[in-house]
Amino acid sequence: MKREQIEGVAEDLAGKAQSAVGRLVEDPALEAEGDARQAAGQVTKTYGDTLDTVSSFVKEKPFAALAITAAVTLVVSRLLRR
């Protein structure tokens, strides 16, 4: 499990707790801040999941990963020349 995945889950849980406290004390700003932390945590976890997937792919198929990288580089360089 990547560091980003762990951080994302922790931030998500902290956001859920903060939202719950905001609802409990009837503080909409605190609740909204908790919702934002929860969303940020989910994004961070998804980023970590993506890193894990890409890392696994590169380890399993290094030549395919190299070919994909070369193709993307070629396309980007062609687009930037215009």
UniProtKB/Swiss-Prot annotation:
Gene3D superfamilies the record matches: YjbJ
Matches recorded under Pfam families: CsbD (PF05532)
Family that this chain belongs to: Belongs to the UPF0337 (CsbD) family.
Protein name in the entry: UPF0337 protein PP_2059
Signal peptide: none
Lineage top rank: taxon: Bacteria
